From Swiss-Prot:
InterPro entries: GCS_T (IPR006223), GCS_T_bac (IPR022903), GCST_C (IPR013977), GCV_T_N (IPR006222), GcvT/YgfZ/DmdA (IPR028896), GcvT/YgfZ_C (IPR029043), TrmE/GcvT_dom1 (IPR027266)
Assigned keywords, A-Z: Aminotransferase, Transferase
Catalytic activity annotation: N(6)-[(R)-S(8)-aminomethyldihydrolipoyl]-L-lysyl-[protein] + (6S)-5,6,7,8-tetrahydrofolate = N(6)-[(R)-dihydrolipoyl]-L-lysyl-[protein] + (6R)-5,10-methylene-5,6,7,8-tetrahydrofolate + NH4(+)
Family: Belongs to the GcvT family.
Protein's recorded name: Aminomethyltransferase
NCBIfam families hit by this protein: gcvT, PRK00389.1
Length: 374
């Protein structure tokens, strides 16, 4: 049986097309994916992301626990409210999930994890927490709303009290503060500025309606996917999973290798993989007509000029750029060109760094893009 967020009736009343997303009935769009996408790039849009899982961790040794559990190092989080992005790995170095962790207070951290991996995540965390005396509290009482776009923060700020506005003023990216009943974080999944706001479920409908009245457009999963793809952000189950190393998913920057004595889960496997030259994740741009899709095979050449193959992990038409873009897993060291066959035609691709649009601006040169380095 599919689950519903507390905002389900609101979505239906606003004309959303609802679909089953990993067991949750979620809005795909409210009439126009393209208009919703452009609203986030040019103004402000909002997403119900209450299907995601919020987990609070408590304990005297909770920091030690997370330094063991996560590939990134929460020792970097010294200021309450600061957050970081990390992979949670298995012993083989595969990605169980990618998540955001917040340092809330002494002996208290908060995780926000994916809905599709909820049960596996909770089981994995629960398996390793007892050795550190950590208490796990899933926050089913909270809803989560993402407000994204160049005017998102100012539109939300206008709804806050003067005291609340002062508390969130000047917050840098990847930071969160509890302001009254709202936990407001400067995070997102679109490549735009904005907030992700956790709040009690019994306040969510009224707050959503306030956001609508403030001129913020409701957006669905379809726009969320094209926005994150333009931003070069991974989607669990496509760019990475339990069989794929973060080194092959453009997540090497999230691995904290220092200090060398920190023995996080999966470290030994990653150290072995480093010497084996794992695959890499690249961006693709196709300027000819056609749409790149996940699962397509691409042809390319390796560092020695020999033919090799890669696989598209995510692909779509880019509403911002007006052409097709994709993320693809390929051998290390390929050149700046690749090819794909669509409907019997071999079409040329430019190989670029993952990430195509940020803050509404193209990261791709108008002519042939610069090739990805090793």
């Amino acid at each position: 049986m599919t689950k519903q967020t507390v905002l389900y009736d609101q979505h239906v009343a606003e004309g959303a097309r609802m679909v089953d997303f990993h067991g949750w009935m979620m809005p795909l769009h409210y009439g126009s994916q393209l208009e919703e996408h452009h609203a986030v790039r040019s103004d402000a849009g909002m997403f119900d992301v209450s299907h995601m899982t919020i987990v609070d961790l408590h304990g005297v040794r909770v920091r030690d626990f997370l330094r063991h559990l996560l590939a990134n190092d929460v020792a970097r989080l010294t200021q309450p409210g600061k957050a970081l992005y990390s992979a949670m790995l298995n012993a083989s170095g595969g990605v169980i999930d990618d998540l955001i962790v917040y340092f809330m207070a002494d002996h208290h951290f908060r995780l926000v994890v994916n809905s599709a991996t909820r049960e596996r995540d909770l089981a994995w965390i629960g398996e390793h927490a007892p050795a550190f005396g950590v208490e796990i509290c899933e926050r089913r009482d909270l809803a989560l709303i993402a407000v994204q776009g160049p005017t998102a923060r100012q539109r939300v700020d206008a709804l806050l009290t003067p005291a609340q506005r002062q508390m969130v003023a000047g917050m840098k990216p990847f930071f969160g503060r509890q302001v009254g009943s709202l936990f407001i974080a400067t995070t997102g999944y679109t490549g735009e500025d904005g907030y992700e706001i956790a709040l009690p479920q019994d306040e969510a409908v009224a707050f959503w309606q306030q956001l609508v009245q403030a001129g913020i457009r409701p957006c669905g999963l379809a726009a969320r996917d094209t926005l994150r793809l333009e931003a070069g952000m991974n989607l669990y189950g496509q760019e990475m999973d339990e069989q794929i190393s973060p080194l092959a998913a453009n997540m090497g920057w999230t691995i904290a290798w220092a200090p060398p004595e920190r023995d996080f889960i999966g470290r030994a496997a990653l150290e072995r993989q480093q010497s084996q030259h794992p695959e890499q994740l690249v961006g693709l741009v196709m300027r000819e007509k056609g749409v790149l899709r996940a699962g397509m095979t691409i042809r390319c050449r390796d560092g020695q000029g020999d033919p090799c193959l890669g696989t598209i992990t995510s692909g779509s038409f880019s509403p911002t750029l007006g052409c097709s873009i994709a993320l693809a897993r390929v051998p290390q060291g390929i050149g700046g060109e690749a090819w794909v066959e669509i409907r019997g035609r071999e079409l040329a691709l430019s190989v670029v760094k993952p990430g195509f649009v940020r803050h509404g601006h193209s990261l791709i040169p108008p002519a042939d893009a610069t090739a990805v380095g090793n």
